[in-house]
Amino acid sequence: MPCQPLRTHLVSEFLIVGGGVIGMMTTLQLADAGHSVTLLERGQCGREASWAGGGIVSPLYPWRYSAPISRLSTWSEGYYPELALRLLEETGIDPEYRQKGLLYLRVDDEPRAMAWAREVGKPLERVDADFLYDKEPEAVAGLADALWMPTLGSIRNPRLVSALRARLAAMPSVTLREECEVTGFESAAGRVLAVNTTAGPVAGGQVIVCGGAWASGLLERLEVRLPVRPVKGQMILFKTPPGLVRRVVLMDGRYVIPRADGRVLAGSTLEECGFDKTATPDARESLWESAVKIIPALAECEVEHHWAGLRPGSPDGVPFIGAVPGFDNLHVNAGHYRNGLVLAPASTRLLVDQLLGREPILDTAPYRLSEALASTA
């Protein structure tokens, strides 16, 4: 239902625009630290890219990413087991974090992968066919070897965002405003005074834009040009016998992910088509073909669902995290591209460290907005 008109000009210490996994984790950390937070979401919390993704808690091929992304993903990877357990205990909703490892099939840059693993201390190893088919009996036949990362896990996105929302809704210092679309900003002398919404103006001491694919459009209203664009990704879900697929398997840039209820998710596409979220027959066929190439037995299984989401694309996939130049109280955390859920724990912690004046967990320089904004001027 539409957001009800605000009776007062709400004021919180922190005002967050965008209720995806980035916005909700930021809210959780600020509230945990004893601060009041208002979270504005144009629809329902966690129902855009955060809901639509696959939930692999790693970049698909981590050795192909730049150091700034690797640093965020490495920090985040160890956070999810603890977060999932906390949310289950506090909300009764199991985000279904499962650490069963990941198999990489037909990797064409294996030397680079192994060199990366040695450099960062990851337990990536080359395994033979016996090992591969013992771990994944239904994998495509005829493979001589694979790469195996035993520490990687996955989480079920819809359950994660549901648990985060439930936890925030129970926190007295948090105000959730859903179906509450931002229509503009009031600003003066380099300070955001209020955020105008369909329910009226809302004020906060510090304003944080976590708008995902919509972040650029929001900031344009303040004449800030952030190079973030929507990139569509489509996925399908198979209804399968329990145990058909045992763990995440990745081949030729596509993947299959088993769920606890026996279903198998297959993804994903990369499409530059603006804000169009239409799920298309061509993408469905392409995803089906890729999934069947990985696990041939999926050809006999029903495709139960097919959907699309919009990723926040950015140059090189490195997110923008930190203060917006020219404003005293405006910050952003956006542009995570394919790795929003992967990078969320570290990127939100990095921003919260800056907001609260703490020693940051990582060097903030690679994520600052100043260079990006200068290049678009």
Residue ranges and their predicted role:
Residues L147-Q206:
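Helical element adjacent to the flavin cofactor pocket in flavoenzyme catalytic cores
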